[in-house]
Structures are given as structure tokens and as C-alpha cells.
Swiss-Prot record:
The gene is Mindy3. This is Ubiquitin carboxyl-terminal hydrolase MINDY-3. Keywords: Apoptosis, Hydrolase, Nucleus, Phosphoprotein, Protease, Thiol protease, Ubl conjugation pathway. Belongs to the MINDY deubiquitinase family. FAM188 subfamily. The modification Phosphoserine is found at residue 124. PANTHER family: UBIQUITIN CARBOXYL-TERMINAL HYDROLASE MINDY-3 (PTHR12473:SF17), UBIQUITIN CARBOXYL-TERMINAL HYDROLASE MINDY-4-RELATED (PTHR12473). GO terms for biological process: apoptotic process; protein K48-linked deubiquitination; proteolysis. Hydrolase that can remove 'Lys-48'-linked conjugated ubiquitin from proteins. It catalyses: Thiol-dependent hydrolysis of ester, thioester, amide, peptide and isopeptide bonds formed by the C-terminal Gly of ubiquitin (a 76-residue protein attached to proteins as an intracellular targeting signal). Its EC number is 3.4.19.12. The active site is at residues 51, 286. It comes from Mus musculus (Mouse). Its main location: nucleus.
Length: 444
């Protein structure tokens, strides 16, 4: 794999200026796709960091399981069903990253070796003989950063059919200690290193943070949409003559982030309103998955929801109001009557105290009365967190709950203010959540 190793490693890990630190981060990423013993379709995450790959894979696996499978008991998965689900999901993500000028790529062990064999042949004779005496798991454990990358190869395929056969054939590899990294490299090489560099705002910023080990937004977006752009808004923007790339079409799986609730960013509708009711949920340090089985949640937006979205484009700081001078622009954007006399009449009605601002709530009630959300008012939801220590009784299982979406008025029911609720309120401002467990699901 020498022809791409240096470029690939710099793209993922950056310049390795501190070998000890990089090895520490690398070790946190060395795990396979392993299913929970307590939840047949849930993947486990052992250390902080690889959620940037595991959570998107989990989300697309749920999409396949809930909306393409004929299983009645979706939470019960046999080993054969797990194999089919995982391989189908990995293929879908690689396929979404495919660039028509390249080929489908898989990164695997050199000459088809198992990780145990690779570990035994890769070191000095003393090391190898020592490893032979230990379990195969320990042998894999001994593979460090340099040795691992010397023992992998790139394989190219011309058709999706060939790719699928190879992914199925290598099923055991995806579950071994390096499965997540081998899959990540497969996606990156399928997309093309230059294509990725051209999408990232700062090409010198690695996809995996060299200090904390977290995946970048570009990496998350690549796995979700097939494009490694650095931003989560709709379309491209220009700032000081520099083009900032965003999301260009509705995603199959969505993305919500606590960072929006904290006003660090604004997620666009292409990620916030995906094709399927499954969302990656980001905290400051971790990624989890929020999902439902009700497709009504992703029905086309109602006029009131469109109005809310348009209003908020004129309220970039999410204050809940706009200057009254912007009312005409908002009404024109929504194809409402916008002649000057009517605009002045509405200004006086919506701002009777003459404060010079128009509040979102009264605006929606004036022009879109009795129009709630186009989705259901109450629906069953689930939350997934791959870290054992973040789950009840340290068992990776889906947490079930009921979501209630209120109207514009002050909700009569108010549950606790929690990180997951604050995050979901960026999508459903008046959502309330009731979980079946004693404690609220953790985003970390």
C-alpha cells in the first residue's frame, strides 16, 4: 500500500510529530464492528473517538433494518442477519462515496493474511515467537501504528457487485480489532484523497484530531452524504472571497448537534430533515443515534414549518425575532401579500409596542393559524449510545421513549431540561420526551 500510505496517513492522522501521542490515539481507534450481546443490531464502541465511523454505520444499519427488511421483530437478529446487515451497510456507504473517475476500493490485510498472522510475521523473531505463545487477541494487540500500516493493501473493484462479494468474503475482517480503520480507509480511497482535500476547508487539518482523537465534521459528512465538506448548512456560502462548501441535497440519514443549541453553528434542512427518521446526534465529544420507525416524521414540511425555516434564515443568531425592517423580505420569500400598506399594517399588529422587532411566535400564529407540525403529535423514539459505560447497567441497548411535539403556545407538559432534549429542540422546538428508563439517555 506504499503508493498511497503517506498521503492517506497525513489526511487521517496529520503529521506524526508526537509518536507516543499518535499511538495512544491510534489504539483508541483499533476496534472492529462488534454487536452488543444485549441488543442484536447495536454496535459497541470501546473507547472514545471511533464514534465518527461507528455511529454513521449504526444509523445506516438501522435504515436497512427498519425500512428495507421484512422482519417483524426488528430487535432480534441472528448472527447471519447481523452479517447481512453489516455487509450491506458497509457497501452502501462505500458506494455513496464512489467517484465516477475512480474505482471501488477495499483495504485489507496484505496477501489476505489474518490479523493474527500479520502480527506474527511483522516483528523481530523474538517478538514473533512471544506472540505465538499468546492468544491471537494479544497478537493483534501488539500491532502498532507503523506495523499495521505496513501490512495492509488496497484492492480495487470495477463494479458494485464485485465490491459486495468482497465485503461479504471479508466479513470476519470487519469484526477484528482493525475493522473500523480498514473500513474508514476503504471509504477514503474510494472517494479519492484529492477529492477529499478539495472539499475540506483546511486541507492541513486531519480527519482525526491528533490531540483528542475525535473525527472531524468533514469525516462525519463524508460517511453521511458521500461528500467531505466541512459545514452542515444548506448549499455553499461565501465569506471574504472564500467559498465555504455545505450540503447540497437531502441526506438519507440526518444530523443534529448540541452545538446548534449552544449557538456555535446552524444545521441546514438537508441534514435536519432527512429522508428517513434517523439522526446522528452530536455532543461536544461524542456521536449517538436518535431514531424512530414512523416515516410521518420525515413527511414534506407543512407551510408553517417552511415559514419557520424562512423566518430563521433572517434570524441567524436564533434570537426568536427579526428587525421589523426585515418583515417585507420574509413575507416576499413566503409569497405572502407584501404591498407597503399591508406590511405597515402587519408591523403595527405584530409589534404593538413599537419595539422595532417581530417575534417568531406571533408571526406564525398570524399567518399560519391552526397549523401544527406535519408529523404526528406523539411518537415512539429510540436512542443508541455505543459506549457501555454510558448505558444503563453498562449494557449497550436502545433506550425507548415517547416524544410529544407541542404547538406554538407554551406547552402544558414540561419534562427536564437535558442535553438530548436541547439538541432535539433544534429540530422540534416544542418537543417533550418521556423515557422508559429511570435516567435520561446520555449524549456522551
Amino acid at each position: 500500500m506504499s503508493e498511497v500510505t503517506k498521503e492517506l496517513l497525513e489526511l487521517v492522522w496529520g503529521t506524526k510529530s508526537s509518536p507516543g501521542l499518535s499511538d495512544t490515539i491510534f489504539c483508541r481507534w483499533t476496534q472492529g464492528f462488534v454487536f452488543s450481546e444485549s441488543e442484536g443490531s447495536a454496535l459497541e464502541q470501546f473507547e472514545g473517538g471511533p464514534c465518527a465511523v461507528i455511529a454513521p454505520v449504526q444509523a445506516f444499519l438501522l435504515k436497512k433494518l427498519l425500512f428495507s427488511s421484512e422482519k417483524s421483530s426488528w430487535r432480534d437478529c441472528s448472527e447471519e442477519e447481523q452479517k447481512e446487515l453489516l455487509c450491506h451497510t458497509l457497501c452502501d456507504i462505500v458506494e455513496s462515496a464512489y467517484d465516477s473517475s475512480g474505482s471501488y476500493c477495499l483495504v485489507s490485510w496484505l496477501r489476505g493474511r489474518t490479523p493474527e498472522e500479520a502480527a506474527r510475521i511483522s516483528g523481530s523473531p523474538a517478538q514473533s515467537s512471544c506472540q505465538v505463545e499468546h492468544s491471537s487477541a494479544l497478537a493483534v494487540e501488539e500491532l502498532g501504528f507503523e506495523r499495521f500500516h505496513a501490512l495492509i493493501q488496497k484492492r480495487s473493484f470495477r463494479t458494485v457487485s464485485e465490491l459486495k462479494d468482497a465485503v461479504l468474503d471479508q466479513y470476519s475482517m470487519w469484526g477484528n480489532k482493525f475493522g473500523v480503520l480498514l473500513f474508514l480507509y476503504s471509504v477514503l480511497l474510494t472517494k479519492g484523497i484529492e477529492n477529499i482535500k478539495n472539499s475540506i476547508e483546511d486541507a492541513n487539518e486531519p480527519l482525526i484530531d491528533p490531540v483528542y482523537g475525535h473525527g472531524s465534521q468533514s469525516l462525519i459528512n463524508l460517511l453521511l452524504t458521500g461528500h467531505a465538506v466541512s459545514n452542515v448548512w444548506d448549499g455553499d456560502r461565501e465569506c471574504s472571497g472564500m467559498q465555504l462548501l455545505g450540503i447540497h441535497e437531502q441526506a438519507a440519514v440526518g444530523f443534529l448537534t448540541l452545538m446548534e443549541a449552544l449557538r456555535y453553528c446552524k444545521v441546514g434542512s438537508y441534514l435536519k430533515s432527512p429522508k428517513f427518521p434517523i439522526w446522528i446526534v452530536g455532543s461536544e465529544t461524542h456521536l449517538t443515534v436518535f431514531f424512530a420507525k414512523d416515516m410521518a416524521l420525515v413527511a414534506p414540511e407543512a407551510p408553517s414549518e417552511q415559514a419557520r425555516r424562512v423566518f430563521q434564515t433572517y434570524d441567524p443568531e436564533d434570537n426568536g425575532f427579526i428587525a421589523d425592517s426585515l418583515l417585507e423580505d420574509v413575507m416576499k420569500a413566503l409569497d405572502l401579500v407584501s404591498d407597503p400598506e399591508y406590511i405597515n399594517l402587519m408591523k403595527n399588529k405584530l409589534d404593538p409596542e413599537g419595539l422595532g422587532i417581530i417575534l417568531l411566535g406571533p408571526f406564525l400564529q398570524e399567518f399560519f393559524p391552526d397549523q401544527g407540525s406535519s408529523g404526528p403529535e406523539s411518537f415512539t423514539v429510540y436512542h443508541y449510545n455505543g459506549l457501555k459505560q454510558s448505558n444503563y447497567n453498562e449494557k449497550v441497548m436502545y433506550v425507548e421513549g415517547t416524544a410529544v411535539v407541542m404547538g406554538f403556545e407554551d406547552p402544558m407538559l414540561q419534562t427536564d431540561d437535558t442535553p438530548i432534549k436541547r439538541c432535539l429542540q433544534t429540530k422540534w422546538p416544542y418537543i417533550e420526551l418521556l423515557w422508559t428508563t429511570d435516567r435520561c439517555p446520555s449524549l456522551n
